[in-house]
Amino acid sequence: MTYPTTARTLLGNIEHNLRGIRARVGDRLVLAAVKANAYGHGAAAVSQMIERTGAADWLGVATVEEGLQLRDAGVSLPILKFSPTRDVDDVTRALLAGITLSVVDEASIAQVAAAADALDLSEVAVHLKVDTGMRRVGAEPADAPALAASIAGHPRLRLQGVFSHLPISDSPAGDEFTRQQAALFADTAAAIEAGVGPVELKHLANSGGVLGHPETWFDLVRPGIMIYGSLPDPQAQRTVDLHPGLELTTRISFVKPVAKGETVGYGRTWTAPRDTYVATIPVGYGDGYSRLLSNRGRVVIGGASYPIAGRVCMDQTMIDLGPDPVAAVGDEAVLIGRRGDAEITVSDVAELMGTIPYEVTCLITPRVTREAVD
């Protein structure tokens, strides 16, 4: 028997979102970010769908291991690893698997070049990451032309791409900063191309850039959270119709009467305000359903929304059904998703947790049953 708590990836909705992104950005290439297990949606299933349908042109990962897992799943699309790779064995494994690496300084360039030499590979494509304002990883813009020349000067390397990242493109408060970043990136790319010739792929736009900043689109865009149906920020422009990429459901395991004045759960933090019935569902923070939802989250049962009663436990959570329950053991409980007119979105859960949609889906743990449906 499968674990009754199920994360269901809605591949048709994810494809719809990618089609909407394509329609918005025109003839630019699309790189789908599938790092962190496709933001908790299942990287193999999502990537296989993307390759099968042609919904995107590239995939993006955070680690070499993530890229290798996609290759093991039969995915042959181009894969870009976003951050530099410092481990020699990882560089070698990446090149053997055809994973495109990012470089940020002379050391990372030399490391890829040495691996290419050792493997007798030629025309090994790399992407040079430039820091235009994130202040996290990347070459300084003033240093980028010299680094590009270093890449171009190595007989086994090819500078395929130049890219940067936007820290506040999803918020109107950051519009001017984003425009400044786009201008700096354009100037830096022009300086690079003046020295080494045309660069095939210049890319800057993330989800916020796709939604609200056409000046960031360049040759390729790199959407992330919007692929999976959520806005990167509640204030982000809604310029693409997005459908939810995931449902999280379980089934009621127990129902019992609770008298007015009785308490429920650890710490006795919830007191029944009237005679009621409380349902238990087999999901908790051990499944990635955050304890921050204690006494504030809701679930959908039978097309109606009900509140969490007490603290979310490691493996179970209690729900106040009210004095006249229609629910019974075995009935479905929806933690993320829609039934009838009642809906709980990833963004709803994120707001209650005081976090972002990215974290909500990334928290889902391996013991939750996984399904992927069209």
Where are these regions (language model features)?
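Active-site anion/phosphate-binding pocket segments in diverse small-molecule metabolic enzymes
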Residues: 2-15, 19, 23, 66, ...
